[in-house]
Amino acid sequence: MAKLEAQQKDDLQEKLIAVNRVSKVVKGGRIFSFTALTVVGDGNGKIGYGYGKAREVPAAIQKAMEKARRNMVTVELNAGTLHHPVKGRHTGSRVYMQPASQGTGIIAGGAMRAVLEVAGVHNVLSKAYGSTNPINIVRATVDALVHMKSPSQIAAKRGLNVDEIRG
């Protein structure tokens, strides 16, 4: 079992996005703990994010990584970029991403960049609107990527060929 877990861990890229110290106020004072936000991906369209909380930083990061590995989704990519422009939203955060030509790179900020890198997107133009809270940006980015449809998915839904869809 441990060998299988280690092997699974090796082929995934892991990125730590944020670590915060949070406190709980009790009668005797404050109790400090730490939260960690992480993303993992295989660089080929599989991504997951996790949020962990513990009394120590390493434990919070480990919990977040485990949650990210458990909650992975698959995204259809088009040769290192997106199929079409997409929008995603989560609470007060909105993100917009559009495909870019070869050599453009990842034009994205902070948390969105980390998600796109581990997903395997190499060329994309993106913008975050509203709240730039890293948790909400990550969730909005994953939401946008999940709702992106490839031409083959659209053709299958309409009962047509891909050539008929593209015109």
UniProtKB/Swiss-Prot annotation:
GO terms of biological process kind: translation
S5 DRBM domain span: 12-75
Keywords of the record: Ribonucleoprotein, Ribosomal protein, RNA-binding, rRNA-binding
Entry GO MF terms: rRNA binding; structural constituent of ribosome
Written domain comment of the UniProt record: The N-terminal domain interacts with the head of the 30S subunit; the C-terminal domain interacts with the body and contacts protein S4. The interaction surface between S4 and S5 is involved in control of translational fidelity.
Assembly description: Part of the 30S ribosomal subunit. Contacts proteins S4 and S8.
Similarity comment: family membership: Belongs to the universal ribosomal protein uS5 family.
Protein name (record): Small ribosomal subunit protein uS5
